[in-house]
Amino acid sequence: MNVRDEGKTTAEKHGGGEENKSPENKWRFNSPLAQVSLMGFVCFCCPGMFNALSGMGGGGQVDPTAANNANTAVYTAFTVFGLLGGGFYNVLGPRLTLAAGCSTYVLYAGSFLYYNHHHHQAFAIVAGALLGCGAGLLWAGEGAVMTSYPPPHRKGTYIALFWSIFNLGGVIGGLIPFILNYQRSSAASVNDSTYIAFMCFMFAGVLLSFGILPATSVIRNDGSRCSAVKYSRPSTEAAAVLRLFLDRKMLLIVPAAWASNFFYSYQFNNVNGLLFNLRTRGFNNVFYWGAQMAGSIAIGYVMDFSFKSRRARGFTGISLVAVIGTIIWAGGLANQHGYSLDKLPEKKLDFKDSGIEFAGPFVLYMSYGLLDAMYQSMVYWLIGALADDSQTLSRYSGFYKGVQSAGAAVAWQVDTRKVPLMSQLIVNWSLTTVSYPLLVLLVYFYVKNDNDDDSNDKV
């Protein structure tokens, strides 16, 4: 049976009629493809550029302390608003939620432009706290769109599409400091033009967010609609979010959520930041985020097409990420034996001048990006397999991002307090390793095959 025939069957299950007829125009603004793609470009402009800025190590500054403290503020606030973001999304709808979230990214980049001249941390820390609030809103909206708008049997493909567009922002964001600081091979911090360019992209993200449609306006190619959401009162949403702490499905995801951003401070500050000079950090980030695009596409294919059984695809995806993750972290262990905070490299690596010495750390850093995308895309696929309506999934995504941010807030302070680099690496490796068997249990007990019941036909 082809895809079109499947769509007709789905429509018939829900009564047929005009509402469930397949749209004649497959290239529509209200299609899941257009909406997920637009969501990708919103994140391209805002968190994509934020990732590129963070990936410079220390926010592009010679001393990472201000950036570490600002990031701690970001993720502390994100912990709260990540949990509540689904409630805001369900009350405000996608456009207001996303626009409010995106606007805080512009302020954050502007705070580092200010810091470039005045070296006062207060503005960066306050802007970081506001960004944490905004990021909670943005990612709750993103999670609902990405996991509930696509058809159930193609969620991995749409996650890969989103992740590729989103991480293209990191690629372009890596090119910005690389190009604007190319002739400054001995510079310690990026110039003003770099921060201004980031701010322009982030403001574009604010404008794009107004194009995201509510779930009830999105029509799939088979004529089915996404689950209609009856927006709830804040008190109702607060109670629903609190109940997630007793939800066994969410408890099994907690270690993966905690681990999924914990390693950023180590990778950005202590691999890219300590081993490479300024312009090479931007060069490296192009490939770090480019590898994320490849990783998301690869794992998306596995999670959607490797086996007919959804559960088998889940087990296969987790196993593949576990094997690749073990290999990459083992490579990181070998690399970490070469330096420490007490014994830093005498000269930082340059992509043009360091020759073969540059290759090993560069490939490792790029591999970290590959693993990050595979790991997070896998977890998002699992979350998407637990439900099909945007209200539930916005809460699940908000819970995931909230726990993720709590871990990141701790990680940035771990780095600020100069914890030995080898200890940081071992903790990062251990956290991801612990999460794999728990995700296997999640699939075993709570992920159902497409034909187990009719829940996956919900429209």
From Swiss-Prot:
Keywords: Membrane, Transmembrane, Transmembrane helix. It holds the Pfam family UNC-93. Signal peptide: none annotated. Coiled coil: none annotated. Residues 1-26 are annotated as: Disordered. It comes from the Eukaryota. One of its GO terms (cellular component) is membrane. It is a multi-pass membrane protein. PANTHER family: ET TRANSLATION PRODUCT-RELATED, UNC93-LIKE PROTEIN C922.05C. Belongs to the unc-93 family. This is UNC93-like protein 1. It comes from Arabidopsis thaliana.
